Amino acid sequence: MKGVTIHNFCYSYFKVCLLVMSLAYGSAEWDGSSSQIAKTIIVNPNDARYFKTVQSAIDSIPLQNQDWIRILISNGIYSEKVTIPRGKGYIYMQGGGIEKTIIAYGDHQLTNTSATFTSYPSNIIITGITFKNKYNIASSSSPTKPAVAAMMLGDKYAIIDSSFDGFQDTLYDDYGRHYYKRCVISGGIDFIFGGAQSIFEGCTLKLRVGIYPPNEVYGTITAQGRDSPTDKGGFVFKDCTVMGSGKALLGRAWKSYSRVIFYRSMFSDNILPIGWDAWKAKGQEGHITFVEFGCTGVGADTSKRVPWLTKASEKDVLQFTNLTFIDEEGWLSRLPIKF
């Protein structure tokens, strides 16, 4: 039998450490393939060996990166605005869970500049992290303004077991194909908005209308921005739960061909009977696709919904609820995590 060399021992020890850390950081797991995860870097402000901020870890990744690099973010509250710039794709951000790893800031005023977290490139994975915009959450005295927690602008994103916390315009899901699974999204006004092509599966949508600030009469969950009949965008909510405080619409049309589908989801009594608003597409209701199919709960009664609510068969709906809506070429199955 060969002796154990220092090199072999160190390499084996490193692999064991990574495995232990992977199991400790969220429920999505690394599949163990060194060919898929090329490098792991760590953020821990309390250890001089590692990066002190999330942004400094991202800054260390070379432009035009083509290999998956994992950023393990230690538990804690990170008070910083974080941006993944163009040309820095294939980043896997892994936190310790939504109650443990929190990136929070309080910028506000404009949707395109206020985000706590902004991601431009394609090929991004996020697990076990809360992105929070603190503006208007802890104070009822501030005027309501756009205050984005996260702005997603790239293609092929998988966001698992994460949280987006804010009040107005919490999640700016604007471009690309995105898969959100077991996420929590909180807010009061248009708190999931944009033009992306996304499936939200097993997610919890938490309303905080009437609390911060108290003068809001009712809120809106979605404001989807599909703007033409050929636009592939749309928000699909599959097996989700809507709950929280106050009353809200399921959505309002931000653009003329807005598309939102709720499938097999549970609505609490927070949902207003009318359900939806044509908003920016008034007079063009025939272009809007707002669907509720197989939903349950007190708020799922559609007898008093808007008369132009889309009538869809199960066959019609399944073309959107199937993962092929965002994943015709199988990119999700090629990701270096299991979820």
UniProtKB/Swiss-Prot annotation:
Glycan attachment residues as annotated in the record: 112, 322
Record site: Transition state stabilizer: 168
Reactions the enzyme catalyzes: [(1->4)-alpha-D-galacturonosyl methyl ester](n) + n H2O = [(1->4)-alpha-D-galacturonosyl](n) + n methanol + n H(+)
Signal peptide from the UniProt entry: 1-28
Transmembrane feature ranges: none
Location(s) in or outside the cell: Secreted, Cell wall
Keyword presence, Membrane: no
Pathway info: Glycan metabolism; pectin degradation; 2-dehydro-3-deoxy-D-gluconate from pectin: step 1/5
GO process annotations (BP): cell wall modification; pectin catabolic process
EC id: 3.1.1.11
Highest taxon above the source species: Eukaryota
UniProt-annotated catalytic positions: 169 (proton donor), 190 (nucleophile)
Residues that hold substrate according to the record: 116, 252, 254
Recorded family membership: Belongs to the pectinesterase family.
PANTHER family: ACYL-COA THIOESTER HYDROLASE YBHC-RELATED, PECTINESTERASE 10-RELATED
Listed name of the protein: Putative pectinesterase 10
Species the sequence originates in: Arabidopsis thaliana (Mouse-ear cress)
